[in-house]
């Protein structure tokens, strides 16, 4: 009975070790799952490339996050122009100054 418990415990330790090695090899860790704070680099060009990965609920095109407006001139959703938005931040960007 005692040896079977030892065998089960040893098997669990080996499985956890193998799983940890696999996750660390493919780059999955708690640090990679944290969404970066992009507010300081949030502009029309998104200077921080890490922020571009987190266009939550937004479209991504040509290096920027885009937000579709609700309705523009009764156009279907596919034909509507997209408005650039900050990644990680729900505020609308102001137009670039000339």
Swiss-Prot record:
Gene Ontology, cellular component aspect: extracellular region
What Pfam families does the record tag this protein with?
Answer: Defensin
Which cysteine-cysteine pairs are annotated as disulfide bonds in the entry? 38-88, 42-65, 51-86, 55-87
List GO BP terms, alphabetically. defense response to fungus; killing of cells of another organism
- Which keywords fit this entry according to its UniProt record? Antimicrobial, Disulfide bond, Fungicide, Plant defense, Secreted, Signal
Q: Which InterPro entries does the UniProt record give?
A: Defensin-like_dom
Q: Where in the cell is it found?
A: Secreted
- List the signal peptide residues: 1-19
According to its UniProt record, which protein family does this protein belong to? Belongs to the DEFL family.
The molecule here is called: Defensin-like protein 68
- What is the species listed in this Swiss-Prot or TrEMBL entry? Arabidopsis thaliana (Mouse-ear cress)
